[in-house]
Amino acid sequence: ETYPGEAFFSQYYVDKSSAEAQQRQGKYLSSAYCKGAWVTPIAPDAETVAPDQATSTISADYGYYDPTGDSFLQGNVVIDQQGRQIRAERVTIDQTQTYAKAEGNVQLAQSGLISQSDDINYNLKTQQGDLYNSFYIAEQQHAHGRAEKIAKTSDNTLELENATYSTCPPDQKPTWKIQAEKIKLNQETGRGETKNTKLYVKDVPVLAVPYFNFPIDDRRTTGILTPIFGFT
């Protein structure tokens, strides 16, 4: 890889003229400065079922079920929850069929979001969990980055620790990126918040602030607008 996460990001970053991008019918495409666009496995406007009503369909190369203890799945594991999906090399599910630990190139996809992690701890009933050592893509926000930990606290909220965030094309040195101790992305409000933040331009730090609030979608807000970075 020429930059961290290249193998993962290249799966979902496509040319705007490609058949995959055209399936979005012009929705969620990045700015005119970018030739490419993110296309994730589950579209941002895909219908989902409420966590307490969703059923899980599970497949794997090998499975072992123990009604008195943990159950194990190994090899091409897929857990499909009607609009949400986990893929992993290995998954352990507890006796109550509530908590799952997934390991090995774990991909979690839902409504325009996809991540790849070393491992995750996931509640199958609430569909919340913690992801460790992750790369992530947010299609609707044209964004990507990496994080030591991602906490999925609700369908609409992600909390990232020691993370980066950029809306530039994936590259070794993106035109700009935010690096922060904590990043909170709230799709319901359309805002992102960061703590102990540095702004990098071409991998050079140009600004450091203790707190930063920025839009993650196209909704209009009052107050100071964050800058839009362009390049030629």
Regions found by a protein language model. Give the residues of each.
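Structural signature for solvent-exposed beta-strand/loop edge elements and short helix-capping sites
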Residues: 1-232
